[in-house]
Structures are given as C-alpha cells and as structure tokens.
Amino acid sequence: ALAAKLMLSILPPQTSFFKLQVRDDKLGEEIPPEARSELDLSFSKMERMVMDYIAASNDRVVIHQALKHLIVGGNALLFMGKDGIKNYPLNRYVVNRDGNGNVLEIVTKELISRDVLGFDLPVPTPNTGIDETQGGATDDVEVYTYVKLDNGRWVWHQEVLDKIIPETRSSAPKSASPWLVLTFNEVDGEQYGRGRVEEFLGDLKSLE
C-alpha cells in the first residue's frame, strides 16, 4: 500500500509530474506574448510525448519494484538506459561512498546467456567427468559492471571471466549519471541506507 501511494505521488497516471518552461532571466530580452504562447504550447506537447513514452514503457513497473525494495531493504539501484529503466536489488550490487555519502564506485552482477553476449568465451572445465555444459546453468555467465567517478565524470565498463566486454565502455557527466543509487533513510557514515520496515523492527519482533 505504501509503495502504491509513493508511486502515485512520483508518477501520477493522468498528470504530468514535471513542467517545462523558459526562465525569463535566460532570455536576455522580453519576448512578445504570441511567441511565449507558442513556446508554452510546444513545451506542453513535449510533456505529453514524455508521458506517452512512460505509459508505453515498462518504467512504471520497474520503479514500483524499486520502491518496494526501498521500503523493506532501504536500498535500490536504477540504471536509466536507452531501452528503459533497470532495477538492481541489493543482492545484485555493491556501492562505495565517501565520508559525506557521495557515491564513488558501483559494482553490479548479472547472469547473462553466452549467446546474448555475442563473443567467444572459454568454456569452464567441470570438476567431474560429466559434461555439465549442455543445457545447464553454465550457459549463463556472471557479468560485472564497474562504475567509477573519475575526474568529474562517471565511467563504466562490463567484464566477464576477467575480460572486458568489447564496446561496453561508456561515460557520463557527474551531474547526469544514468546510475541512481537510492536509499530510503540515509545514515551518516554508512555505505547503505535503512528501510521503513526497520523502524518497526522492535514491534515486529514483539508480535512473534
């Protein structure tokens, strides 16, 4: 119920949660009312386009999942990629912060099929004499994504079996990172946050 209420406040279904407008101090001169009306109309169309894109995508479902992780576990990681938003639960990533709580490094872990990766990988040698590579879990490999703040920019790449995956290096400005490390209640000096459920942990234990 709490996740649903937070979802409605963050992404209301029939209302835009943001507004595009021009700051008067950035224009440099007064513009006529006709031009301002045309600008407002164009911005309104852009707002509707964004809302239609969100409605057609899977972003609402992913954000709702992240909210539930925040309420219970206090932590979630979102990646805003070209194909939509991806949620990483706490058991799929680690984060390193400085003393002020600023994120410095992120490492994520995923299981991805060898066929999806699209380049040759060494086949692991089984410890037994039985061929375990046919149709088993060995078809999936652990892919790690390493994200680091370097010289004022976020840089990241992906690795598998200690090899960097080709064409996975990317970067973004510090102020426009697609990696969002979320916490419900931030605790000073700690790497991870606390969830809403933890506030009632004593009451929950007494119910047992």
Region annotations inferred by a language model:
Residues 72-73, 79-208:
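Structured, contiguous alpha/beta core segments that scaffold functional sites
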Residues 1-134:
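Extended, helix-rich architectural segments
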